[in-house]
Design a protein with these regions (language model features):
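Exposed beta-sheet edge and beta->alpha loop/turn motif
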Residues: 93-135
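Bacterial signal peptide processing site
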Residues: 23-26
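Short solvent-exposed beta->alpha transition segments
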Residues: 53-100
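C-terminal motif of bacterial Sec signal peptides marking the signal peptidase cleavage site
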Residues: 18-21
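Short, aromatic-enriched amphipathic alpha-helices that serve as compact interaction elements
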Residues: 32-48, 58
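Transition segment at domain starts
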Residues: 29-34, 95
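Hydrophobic helical h-region of N-terminal Sec-dependent signal peptides
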Residues: 10-16
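Bacterial N-terminal signal peptides that target proteins for export
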Residues: 1-10
Length: 135
């Protein structure tokens, strides 16, 4: 009986931990969740279509100086290697962070495995960061 109670308590704690990770932090003042989500999905769409120059050009100037369209392409190639073709968006959320910006987190389904896109925007909705990884 104790073993079963321990198992139930452990599963409840695990579920609580997982669910708490799904809730995003508050967005900075003036940022709209729908706008961040839409902008993130638009950038993700460009990335899945191979429009790396366009994404590079959309980066805020100071961020653009630190990367290249080739680096963005390499990040995508690494994240999607062996996963097949993009199929659909599985889920998405928007979260704030301690810095004054917001991140659209998008889970995308590919033929074989999923990919997670993290796309960051400053308070003026300038693209300031990209992170794409296989799940």
């Amino acid at each position: 009986m104790r073993k079963r109670e321990y198992l139930i308590a452990s599963l409840a704690m695990l579920l609580l931990l997982v669910l708490s990770g799904c809730k995003g932090n508050k967005l900075p003042d003036g940022m709209d969740e729908d706008k961040v989500s839409s902008a993130g999905l638009a950038v993700m769409s460009q990335l899945t279509k191979g429009e790396y120059e366009e994404v590079y050009d959309a980066l805020r100037e100071d961020v653009r100086e630190q990367t290249s369209a080739d680096a963005i392409e390499e990040m995508m190639d690494t994240a999607t290697e062996g996963r097949g073709s993009f199929k659909k968006v599985k889920d998405s959320m928007v979260t704030g962070v301690t810095e004054p910006h917001a991140i659209a987190v998008i889970g995308a389904k590919y033929d074989k495995k999923s990919v997670v896109f993290r796309i960051a925007f400053d308070t003026e909705m300038n693209l300031i960061g990209l992170d794409v990884r296989g799940k």
